[in-house]
Amino acid sequence: MSSPLLPVGVFDSGVGGLTVARAIIDQLPDEDIVYVGDTGNGPYGPLSIPEIRAHALAICDDLVGRGVKILVIACNTASAACLRDARERYDVPVVEVILPAVRRAVAATRNGRIGVIGTRATIASHAYQDAFAAARDTEITAVACPRFVDFVECGVTSGRQVLGLAEGYLEPLQRSGVDTLVLGCTHYPLLAGLIQLAMGENVTLVSSAEETAKEVLRVLTERDLLRRHDAPPVNRVFEATGDPEAFIQLAARFLGPAVSGVQPARLHSRVR
């Protein structure tokens, strides 16, 4: 049986999932966190589904093997590729980023027209479109915005070049008259101001990061796994499969100095 003292395991293809980690820290400040960013293999967007699945499950195997009380797949592309496998594979609860955002978008829309933006792999998987299928009276427009991740990973989140790119990507959503837009990649909240500017103030942006943190809180509460206020001091560990120094520089934009002690990830698991 899981212990409330075990950490929350968070995994992403790179630094984007730190938006989820930030939201978890804000909403559950007493929780220990182990975060692994697969910067050595990410971004996942251009990869094939089998490649994404292999990389993602190797890291998830390692996190679960080390001992976590809940596993958060903080990557839309990985959620679309391996969520079912992960839930069948592990005894701990697995939280992903797609369904929480879908629920929030359905609640937020006024005209039933909802947009989704994400990586090519996420949009091509139809994971969001399928998740919205159960919602009545909704019309979904999904658009891939592959270069957004490249700009965020390079630390560029504003400026005329990115705004021009955003206006081009988002034009089909404006034509569709969406009033709610799901940021279907955990990198995209860092571009939220720019996306809002391109879409207009009347469009509601839904962050999968914030909604995922709410789902983590709900699951831990439901299973009586919340860490007590009087538990030992909080310990947050951040690891990267690629260059830790490069990760630190990018991660500072998400979490500030809290990630100064990034460690190289040493994975021992293999996908079966």
Swiss-Prot record:
Gene3D superfamilies, alphabetized: 3.40.50.1860
Residues in the signal sequence: none
Active site (catalytic residues): 75 (proton donor/acceptor), 185 (proton donor/acceptor)
Protein name: Glutamate racemase
Function: Provides the (R)-glutamate required for cell wall biosynthesis.
Reaction(s) catalysed by this chain's protein: L-glutamate = D-glutamate
GO molecular function, one term: glutamate racemase activity
Keyword Protein biosynthesis: no
Transmembrane segments annotated in the record for this chain: none
Gene transcribed to yield this protein: murI
Amino-acid positions noted as binding substrate in the UniProt annotation, renumbered to this chain: 12-13, 44-45, 76-77, 186-187
Protein's GO biological process: cell wall organization; peptidoglycan biosynthetic process; regulation of cell shape
Family designation: Belongs to the aspartate/glutamate racemases family.
Keyword Isomerase appears in the UniProt entry: yes
Organism this protein belongs to: Mycobacterium leprae (strain TN)
